[in-house]
Amino acid sequence: MSKTKTFEENLQDLETIVNKLENGDVPLEEAISEFQKGMLLSKELQKTLQAAEKTLVKVMQADGTEVDMDD
């Protein structure tokens, strides 16, 4: 059973992929595969950040209703 990785773990994985690709000593097939993994990680990280932003822009009023902070 695999556990879901945290935002920080996914970010570290993405940084590892970027560093590997920046070094340039990766065979083409592996570079393409790593690039695809990196793109998937990037999308997942973006979704996590967007969800966090939605949570942070709302505040609870005393009566329990939510108010958008960007109004």
Swiss-Prot record:
Catalytic activity, as annotated: Exonucleolytic cleavage in either 5'- to 3'- or 3'- to 5'-direction to yield nucleoside 5'-phosphates
Pfam families: Exonuc_VII_S
EC number(s) stated in the UniProt entry for this protein: 3.1.11.6
Primary localisation category: cytoplasm
SUPFAM superfamilies, A to Z: XseB-like
GO cellular component: cytosol; exodeoxyribonuclease VII complex
UniProt keywords, alphabetically: Cytoplasm, Exonuclease, Hydrolase, Nuclease
Subcellular location field: Cytoplasm
InterPro entries per record: Exonuc_VII_S (IPR003761), Exonuc_VII_ssu_sf (IPR037004)
Keyword Cytoplasm recorded: yes
Transmembrane regions: none
Nuclease is among the record's keywords: yes
GO BP of this protein: DNA catabolic process
Enzyme class at the top of the EC tree: hydrolase
Gene Ontology molecular function, alphabetical: exodeoxyribonuclease VII activity
Family indicated by similarity: Belongs to the XseB family.
Function, as annotated: Bidirectionally degrades single-stranded DNA into large acid-insoluble oligonucleotides, which are then degraded further into small acid-soluble oligonucleotides.
Quaternary assembly: Heterooligomer composed of large and small subunits.
Protein name: Exodeoxyribonuclease 7 small subunit
Gene: xseB
